[in-house]
From Swiss-Prot:
This is Scolopendra 4722.07 Da toxin. The keyword Transmembrane helix does not apply. It is found in: Secreted. Expressed by the venom gland. GO terms for cellular component: extracellular region. GO terms for molecular function: toxin activity. The keyword Transmembrane does not apply. Belongs to the scolopendra toxin 2 family.
Length: 15
């Protein structure tokens, strides 16, 4: 699972 969905601001904000 990609954490980008829950904390997109922390992981790049792309998702």
């Amino acid at each position: 699972a990609l954490p980008s969905f829950s904390r997109a601001d922390r992981y790049g904000x792309r998702q």
